[in-house]
Amino acid sequence: MREPDALGALATPSASADPLAPLTRPADVHDAGLVHALYLATPSYFEMIAIPLPTSSEVRTEVLAARQDPRRHIELVLGDPAWRAPGLVRDARTDRPVAGVLDYKLDYPEPGDATINLLLVHGALQGRGVGARVVADLERRLGGSTRRILAAVYGRNPSASGFWEHQGYHFAIDAGPVLDWYAKEIGA
């Protein structure tokens, strides 16, 4: 029998949890603190792409800007209520831990495209299938209205490139010097 890890239910999801349908909800300006806490728990991402960790004020401005663009969506990825890990904060609206953040824009760069600007999973949850489930869920939700999804990979990030390739995306655009796009046709 497998020993439980610090995340408890993540290692052995509850029978009621559907691992293929992660719970997401739109983020609003009141959620900027949750997004910032996620960033603080995942500093290696910002180190890898060689940018300073955004301040809480910068995160608030970014979330507000996204809410003013009808094509752009920032969603909180919410985990199983039983998940526990250092730095994992809870969403007061749902009483679920914030497992990640998804930022995407519809009809960009072309009509019928969707571009994932950021999929960031909490450091303690990386490598456990959370990101793959989020991507599969987004593909399902956009399948009837989107022909192609592009995923932005910033900096020299071989683990992100490998992640997207594993999800069936292929290298599509070198927007260098620090940006590559991976793409997947999904329909429409």
Predicted features by range, described:
Residues 175-185:
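Active-site/acyl-donor-binding loops of N-acyltransferases
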Residues 102-103, 150, 183:
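Residues embedded in well-ordered beta-strands within globular domains across many folds
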Residues 2-13, 18-22, 26-126, 135-137, ...:
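Acetyl-CoA-dependent GNAT
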Residues 135, 142-154:
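Conserved GNAT acetyl-CoA-binding A-motif
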Residues 123-126, 150-161, 177-179:
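Conserved beta-strand-loop-alpha-helix junction that forms the acyl-donor binding cleft
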Residues 129:
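Glycine-rich phosphate-binding loop
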